[in-house]
């Protein structure tokens, strides 16, 4: 609904899709929009993702799963995803939106270019809902697909 409402409010015509894939929603939207641009289905796309899990139900679920950090006395250092002493994540809400555009189209209109997306890949491990497989096969396939595209 959000993508449809935004297109109506701002007169955004062309491909319109709302993808929901949990933590990867924003990344998947970037990849799908990039592919639409590469396939000449659009010159420019508005993409993003949002998450609001800080609700009683969301908090209760993550607490029951013991997924949240217990370092409540030091919230600034509680989030440490790559640390051997990590003990969970810090729950937060957020959103991000960006404009993706065909490079030639952006140059033609004099747009400020912040970065160029040169590939996208996605894959799944078929291992666990949140943990990657120990061999990293899904991540390797994802990177391989990004390099191919």
Label each residue range with its predicted role:
Residues 73-149:
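Condensing-enzyme catalytic core mediating Claisen C-C bond formation in acyl metabolism
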Residues 36-39, 59-72, 134-138:
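A glycine- and small-aliphatic-rich helix-loop capping segment at beta-alpha/alpha-beta transitions
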